[in-house]
Amino acid sequence: MYLSRWFFSTNHKDIGTLYLIFGAWAGMIGTALSVIIRTELSQPGSLINNDQLYNTIITAHAFVMIFFMVMPIMIGGFGNWLVPMMIGAPDMAFPRMNNMSFWLLPPSLMLLLSSSLVSSGAGTGWTVYPPLSNHISHMGPSVDLAIFSLHLAGVSSILGAINFITTIINMKTRSMEMYHIPLFVWSILITAILLLLSLPVLAAAITMLLTDRNLNTTFFDPSGGGDPILYQHLFWFFGHPEVYILILPGFGIISHVVTFYSGKKEPFGYMGMAWAMMAIGFLGFIVWAHHMFTVGMDVDTRAYFTSATMIIAIPTGVKVFSWLATIHGGDIKWEPPMLWALGFIFLFTVGGLTGIVLSNSSLDVVLHDTYYVVAHFHYVLSMGAVFAIMAGLMHWFPLFSGYSINKTWAKIHFWIMFTGVNLTFFPQHFLGLAGMPRRYSDYPDAYSTWNVLSSIGSMVSFVGTIILMFIIWEAFSSKREPNPLSLPLYNPEWIYGTPPTFHTFENPSYLKIIKKE
């Protein structure tokens, strides 16, 4: 019974729970790796005494956080749990494929971790650029294992994407049109489309890299008529949509959290929010070369990618101001999910502003591969995606588990994390402006002050992570029932109680639209 429930599950709630547990586990690995990085950089001089190992840790940190923490939790965890319940579907369209999507991830993570343990590890950075990643600069099977790991994670995501697209389009309850589905469902749909269109390009790129390494092809080797810049174009055609894949489900989560804790019955500008996500998804595919301003492109090409990148700020601004308008005039409940959501809006906006700075090709030539870029993407990931995950976890925890979180501890956790991540990443803007490059294990003494502060912030965040583990343990051990009056019972995912029954919407459900004149 136990084996068949958890290993052969076809229930979207159980698979969502597996994804959440897997993501939490991977998140702890990724956090441990980041603490090693910040410890190495906590003062001038060397700690690890091995730059190849340092770069391997950086590469693993990126892959683990992106493919095994953020994506499984947001798309696999929240997506599986909530999408069928929000559209009144009994389950996902392809329940067994859903199970396979999950079970491809643990082997993928094992391959990635084993790539660090054999030979000298894959010290390529998460971009895996040739010629650094070719068979000459990286001998041994490490990069090949990392490539196979990416293949498995990619297949998992593509299957999941097909499943979500089919479910959302075909399994909505009768009379529910696209413009009735909640914003979180919109965000998962757009994310799934982005995955479906971008991952095959990554698969092509890393497969060509694999044959370059092992079968003597020269796709990316100039000596045989290839071009390493081709790899960069292929990688970033996936890589840029990928960063929107990481943040879009967060947008959906924040829309739900902000609406409920502002005492509103719907978010401000529903249609604008949905169209803004579609615009972000579309624009995300036509700006990839802004990651490549330093490889030598024509001035016209640079002008196009600069302006196209800046245009993404418009739909993003629509979303930020719609969240603020949702809060405006509301009866705000200052509970942990709302704190995370407000932190998200503020810090994601800061990250967006540094993104506008970097979109200028002339400025990016100076700032490329410095800590300014690290600060920028950690503001949108470590304080965008992660804050959104935390907002969603605190908000839907009673739904997933049937127990309530201790609000005092949750608020303490928020303030510790808020302090920690800002102390970690804000000084990195100054380091980048002063010219400190990325992916180096040591630095001149002039950079030590900001690095010390940054590493202290990392320790603060680490304490916050330990407190989160305590909070979740405390909730399960205390077994407090959530107060039904404090739950958003008029939202479809909550109508089956906390936790919901194993099967929901077993009979066809019906949606009645009340049009208010």
From Swiss-Prot:
The keyword Nucleotidyltransferase does not apply. Na(+) binds at residues 40, 45, 441. The chain crosses the membrane at residues 12-40, 51-86, 95-117, 141-170, 183-212, 228-261, 270-286, 299-327, 336-357, 371-400, 407-433, 447-478. It comes from the Eukaryota. Residues 41-50, 118-140, 213-227, 287-298, 358-370, 434-446 are mitochondrial intermembrane. It is a multi-pass membrane protein. One of its GO terms (cellular component) is respiratory chain complex IV. The keyword DNA-binding does not apply. Heme a3 binds at residue 376. It is found in: Mitochondrion inner membrane. Fe(II)-heme a binds at residues 61, 378. Gene3D superfamilies: Cytochrome c oxidase-like, subunit I domain. Cu cation binds at residues 240, 290-291. O2 binds at residue 244. One of its GO terms (molecular function) is cytochrome-c oxidase activity. Keywords: Calcium, Copper, Electron transport, Heme, Iron, Magnesium, Membrane, Metal-binding, Mitochondrion, Mitochondrion inner membrane, Respiratory chain, Sodium, Translocase, Transmembrane, Transmembrane helix, Transport. Its cofactor is heme; Cu cation. Residues 1-11, 87-94, 171-182, 262-269, 328-335, 401-406, 479-517 are mitochondrial matrix. Component of the cytochrome c oxidase, the last enzyme in the mitochondrial electron transport chain which drives oxidative phosphorylation. The respiratory chain contains 3 multisubunit complexes succinate dehydrogenase (complex II, CII), ubiquinol-cytochrome c oxidoreductase (cytochrome b-c1 complex, complex III, CIII) and cytochrome c oxidase (complex IV, CIV), that cooperate to transfer electrons derived from NADH and succinate to molecular oxygen, creating an electrochemical gradient over the inner membrane that drives transmembrane transport and the ATP synthase. Component of the cytochrome c oxidase (complex IV, CIV), a multisubunit enzyme composed of 14 subunits. The complex is composed of a catalytic core of 3 subunits MT-CO1, MT-CO2 and MT-CO3, encoded in the mitochondrial DNA, and 11 supernumerary subunits COX4I, COX5A, COX5B, COX6A, COX6B, COX6C, COX7A, COX7B, COX7C, COX8 and NDUFA4, which are encoded in the nuclear genome. Belongs to the heme-copper respiratory oxidase family. This is Cytochrome c oxidase subunit 1.
